[in-house]
């Protein structure tokens, strides 16, 4: 159910709220926080809940108006700042992060897999406990209670509309194993 708010009233009146199984294809321009074409929103494992733009301003070091599609996560900031300032890496303090300084310099940056673990229900009531892994162009989501998975090719399907888990069982199994191994490692 929708929470009582002015925004949800507008959603209801315009019949644009369709839930996780029927994501919106368009949204009235009054919704400035729309993250279309991404699926989901804050508190979801879908890209609409985990994808955030990163803007870096480093005069004399980064090229103005440049873009990178490098995949980074919050744990990557610390090792990146250490490398930017020339300070020594302290692996015991940042075992999860990878410096993305190469990406800031316009070079290739492959940081490996990124993991998410949400062992709780979301505040909106649609996201059940689960986890996810992103490796390259693929992202796998696992829902713990049902034991179900979804696999998406984010290069071809950024909106996460086409589940490939049945048609790509090898990739699904590989990513699911990596996700389970990671969860055991950090538990």
Put a short name on every predicted segment:
Residues 154, 168-172:
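C-terminal structured subdomain/cap of oxidoreductase catalytic cores
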Residues 20-50, 61-70, 75-154, 185-186:
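C-terminal cap/loop subdomain of S1 sulfatases and analogous C-terminal strand-loop tails that border
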Residues 157:
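Intrinsically disordered, low-complexity polar regions and short flexible loop motifs
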Residues 54-56:
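Short glycine- and hydrophobic/aromatic-rich loop-to-beta-strand nucleating segment
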Residues 160-163:
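Carboxylate-dense, calcium-coordinating segments in secreted/extracellular and ER-lumen proteins
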């Amino acid at each position: 159910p929708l929470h009582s708010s002015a925004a949800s009233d507008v959603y209801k009146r315009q019949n644009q709220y369709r839930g996780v199984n029927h994501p919106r294809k368009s949204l009235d321009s009054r919704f400035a926080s729309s993250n279309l074409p991404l699926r989901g929103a804050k508190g979801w494992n879908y890209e609409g809940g985990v994808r955030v733009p990163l803007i870096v301003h480093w005069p004399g070091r980064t090229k103005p108006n440049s873009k990178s599609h490098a995949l980074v996560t919050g744990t990557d900031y610390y090792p990146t700042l250490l490398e930017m300032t020339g300070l020594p890496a302290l692996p015991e303090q940042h075992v999860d992060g990878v410096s993305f300084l190469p990406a800031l310099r316009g070079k290739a940056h492959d940081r490996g897999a990124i993991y998410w673990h949400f062992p709780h229900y979301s505040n909106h009531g649609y996201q059940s406990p689960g986890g996810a892994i992103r490796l390259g162009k693929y992202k796998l989501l696992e829902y713990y209670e049902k034991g179900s998975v979804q696999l998406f090719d984010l290069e071809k399907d950024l909106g996460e509309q086409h589940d490939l888990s049945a048609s790509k069982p090898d990739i699904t199994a590989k990513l699911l194993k990596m996700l389970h191994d990671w969860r055991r490692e950090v538990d």
